[in-house]
A protein has these predicted regions:
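Flavin-dependent oxidoreductase catalytic cores
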Residues: 1-149
Length: 149
């Protein structure tokens, strides 16, 4: 609460908060999904505009689960059930169709792609083409000549 209120004193824009919904810590010392759903509700009450849901990364623990495209999206979907503000999905969302599926099925409101954009600066244009989005326009005009038509 103190952090959000402090940020609001110096920043008037929308505040996004990243939650790591699990640390994959099998010792039983981490918060539960229900704990994170409650935290998400509190953040919404404080006026947070969006929740960026990820997993792992807080501890040096390798997940003891299968890693596949969209493996973190179930956490986004479960946090989304607890709040009415937008919730993002992340994590190996290399396939534009998978991202679109998560959006269309209500498991997330936004898809975030980090490493995919580092690997391919044309990622958004490629995704738009793959999804047959004929209305997509490149924001930076210098990239237009590189678009596949």
């Amino acid at each position: 609460k103190e952090i959000i209120e402090g940020v609001k004193t110096v920043f008037c824009g929308p505040i996004w908060v990243r939650l790591s919904a699990t640390a994959y810590d099998e010792t039983g010392t981490q918060n539960t999904l229900q704990d994170y759903q409650q935290i998400a509700k509190w953040l919404e009450e404080l006026g947070v505009a969006c929740l960026d849901i990820s997993t792992g990364g807080l501890m040096d623990v390798k997940p003891n689960i299968p890693i596949y495209g969209g493996y973190q999206a179930t956490f986004s979907a479960q946090i989304k059930q607890a709040v009415s503000i937008p919730v993002t999905a992340v994590g190996l969302l290399h396939n534009p169709e998978l991202g679109e599926y998560l959006l269309q099925t209500g498991q997330a409101d936004l898809i975030q792609v980090g490493r995919g954009l580092i690997r391919n600066v044309n990622r958004l244009a490629d995704a738009a083409q793959s999804l047959h989005d004929h209305d997509f326009q490149v924001y930076n005009n210098s990239y237009k000549r590189g678009q596949v038509r």
